[in-house]
């Protein structure tokens, strides 16, 4: 445009506003018969075009606000405890708690069958490796936490208790670590605009996990809670709900004597600053996008394999954590209790657990940390497969 500066709403910046960044779109990668038949080409093409629509985010936010106004007017008559952020949204607003929630999932026969299948896979994995101990922790979320008001919006909601009853079935060869919390505990320990827990909820989960692993008398004790007043945190629920009124602040714990850990991320040497970006936050070196994923920005994004070496540890034991992003803020806590801690994310590393354990024979404990959508995902199923099925 001959060097003329355009307003932000004429550029791709506005299209990126609600996603925390431009949607990765590569139609050429799906320009094949398989891409056409699967629909991947159409999705990629739509994303590529959508990135360039002027005023896209402004229009989305304005439209959602109009719909929300009508819903709130109706709520004056019906008195719902929570209601959709806009018509057809999977995100609900709960004004009394000043938070957003993901509407509960139905307990379909397919979902329950998948849970049973994953449980059987975990059991079979444990049987193939009697020399290791196996633990499973499924983190609650706003879809399944007990007492969530969104469960009243659908019939036959899937609850944490129902999933737990499948995994903790007696006779299994892995130990189920119960992650169930009350709704009050959930409201205190999870972000109000995002699907991730905050550091308080994560630390309570760490205490349960470490106790189950045998470290009840060696638990970390935080020195103080650090709260960052800026930047404001509008997470995945705020983006998907097209809602700007609800915000979180990033919080973290400081410890008086936390050991120095050596870090390797996907084969490259790194530092603790790569796992917790507190220096960036102290220097206000943060993303300008209002809907930036602050959880990933402050802690870290998802990687295939992270290795944490604790040279100060007296332990000769190694830990393998098989996890999704729920572990990103708290894997460092568990690493304090082991010589080496590996964090493997099946979504970004297609190695089976069998293959990993064959190459890392000093691993004594294996701990799964995931919320239900990823625990029941195909990537986890593949990670649990016997290695000889891949040959």
Where are these regions (language model features)?
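Extracellular glycan-modifying ectodomains
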Residues: 1-391
